[in-house]
């Protein structure tokens, strides 16, 4: 009866560069031995290999989703891009409902969203697609522009305006208002900011412009960049032609929830916040791109998809015992995200949350983090489980501080704990599957000697501590991990896992 342990090192990528590479330069004899003396290949952990757009850096959420699901999980940006490309977007029921509501009530369709190609909260192409859809159905559309300046250069909006204005003309869309994201997309309950943006949408109070480009240029003259553009309305139209009125449809084009939630609460109402605007329009049909926590709109374009037969569910159905263990910083990743982005409790499953250090503000001050406590707890219990899933946070969380020396220390402290774990696993005949969710600690100083704190697009290792295993490929993707473990444990791979085992 084989038993396995899946050890995920968060932010542990592989790069041939030596400069600024904490992974390569740390003294980690146990990890080196693990990779050099056991079957090892590399896995792609970024971009299209994990359901993100090409060349987009990986992240912990997406990484664990793909590892646990055994299939590529398409999220936010790439999911909607794909739908626009294959034209399914134009038959999306939530959007068609908004169109129908506007037609039935002889009213307007308002499009709210961050107008930028940053791809973090929204994408300008998604907004264009909604404008096209309204035009196809002869529904009057009003665009309310939120300036970015954070996920793109601070004055990118001006460069995008020619194309935007042209697109508005061809789709017969009126540009109604403009506001910097500082106001329209606040997430810290600074309601005075939301008030300015919201009142501008409802009743055209405050500043106005006759020419949008001039207004943006004038803002720049006053050192007000896209993010901070003061809410203003287009005075070429009567107020009720461009403001949100009773019976209108409203589509919020942002797919990321955190900065769309407060304005959505103002527009449509929710129980999420105690603070409410003085006025809300009646009988709105309010559509959001993806689920925003606490907001119950009329419809969601892409509601959360329940992934069937993730690794955890397959083990449960096979009556296998499983353990999930991580410190606080990454606990959600080995549970919620690993299970397909849902909270589930399986029978024969235990979850151990090891507290992250609270006595330090940043982890470069305690780069060992809680690795020792994780191993202490693990060694007491893990032999009774068929599969243990474990996350060590050090390479990622210390890597994010940009402190190279501390990251070396963190990796070396972690290696010591991994040494203890590997020795015990060997003694108990437990096979260790070792991988990472994305890169980070291997690129900490760039060629200009500047600190690098972000994730990378580098590959991650995949090692198995069984000399009898032979990999069938030289390289794979994160979604190959789950089917590989199932094959090793001689458990049938479900059809939902469309990625093949690598052994």
Curated annotation (Swiss-Prot):
It comes from the Bacteria. Its EC number is 5.4.2.12. Mn(2+) 1 binds at residues 396, 400, 455. Substrate binds at residues 121, 150-151, 181, 187, 256-259, 330. Coiled coil: none annotated. It catalyses: (2R)-2-phosphoglycerate = (2R)-3-phosphoglycerate. Pfam families: iPGM_N, Metalloenzyme. InterPro entries: Alkaline_phosphatase_core_sf, BPG-indep_PGM_N, Metalloenzyme, PGAM_B_sf, Pgm_bpd_ind. It is an enzyme of class 5 (isomerase). This is 2,3-bisphosphoglycerate-independent phosphoglycerate mutase. It comes from Mycoplasmoides gallisepticum (strain R(low / passage 15 / clone 2)). The gene is gpmI.
